[in-house]
């Protein structure tokens, strides 16, 4: 699944307000019941939408929803997984990669849609992007959720051939996690060092357009198959 273009999805709920009906104190009880029934019928019709007896209107609405959903989903270049206290640092790295190196679009995990399960957001973030960047800071080891994130990302890169070498540990300039304290599973992967003199060269070698296009193609094919199975 892809990830939405906007950083934070705004999903206002349209709550239909029921017009208050003033009951006539001197009226009969039957009139009051009739008024309530009429009000309830109007509320149900307004909430569900009045549909014509034929199915002519249903099909255009279904067709119109497809392109809109496709526009909202986009395969990303990268996602940055980070500790909760490192959101600002993650945003700085995102800005660095997008504006200084032209690697876009990218997203940080804190920008994933609200109101959804963390696991669903994690799955969408990892599978909806070409590279998964693990922001290795001092806060990384203190956050249990970060440990789960990097183990899940590594398992995903191993189990799916096209995601091989897609997990990129990165030590940023601010409060980087020392190598000796880095989890053993991540020590086996060559990390992206922002303070290194070869940082720019590393970035160019990692984020290659050919790799992105290949993963994007597989992502589109997977989505197409899933949509066909859902319709069937």
Swiss-Prot record:
Spans through the membrane: none
UniProt-annotated stretches for the region Disordered? 1-70
Where is the TIR domain positioned along the sequence?
74-226
Its subcellular locations are: Cytoplasm; Golgi apparatus; Cell membrane; Early endosome
Gene3D superfamilies according to UniProt = Toll/interleukin-1 receptor homology (TIR) domain
Q: What does this protein do?
A: Functions as a sorting adapter in different signaling pathways to facilitate downstream signaling leading to type I interferon induction. In TLR4 signaling, physically bridges TLR4 and TICAM1 and functionally transmits signal to TICAM1 in early endosomes after endocytosis of TLR4. In TLR2 signaling, physically bridges TLR2 and MYD88 and is required for the TLR2-dependent movement of MYD88 to endosomes following ligand engagement. Involved in IL-18 signaling and is proposed to function as a sorting adapter for MYD88 in IL-18 signaling during adaptive immune response.
By what name is this protein known? TIR domain-containing adapter molecule 2
Origin organism is: Mus musculus
């Amino acid at each position: 699944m892809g990830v939405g273009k906007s950083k934070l999805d705004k999903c206002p709920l349209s709550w239909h307000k029921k017009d208050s009906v003033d009951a006539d104190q001197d009226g009969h009880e039957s009139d009051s019941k009739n008024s309530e029934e009429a009000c309830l019928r109007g509320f149900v019709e307004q909430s569900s939408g009045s549909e014509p007896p034929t199915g002519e209107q249903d099909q255009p609405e279904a067709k119109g929803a497809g392109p809109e959903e496709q526009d909202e989903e986009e395969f990303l270049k990268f996602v940055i997984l980070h500790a909760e206290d490192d959101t600002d640092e993650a945003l700085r790295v995102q800005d660095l990669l997008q504006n200084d190196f032209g690697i876009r679009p990218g997203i940080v995990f804190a920008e994933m849609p609200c109101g959804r399960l963390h696991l669903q957001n994690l799955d969408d973030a990892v599978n909806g992007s070409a590279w998964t960047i693990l922001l290795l800071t001092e806060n990384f080891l203190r956050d249990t959720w970060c440990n789960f994130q990097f183990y899940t990302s590594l398992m995903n890169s191993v189990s799916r051939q096209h995601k091989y070498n897609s997990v990129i540990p990165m030590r940023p300039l601010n409060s980087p996690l020392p190598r000796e304290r880095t989890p053993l599973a991540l020590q086996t992967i060559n990390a992206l060092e922002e303070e290194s003199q070869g940082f720019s060269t590393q970035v160019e070698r990692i984020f290659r357009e050919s790799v992105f296009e290949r993963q994007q193609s597989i992502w589109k094919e997977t989505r197409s198959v899933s949509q066909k199975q859902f319709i069937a």
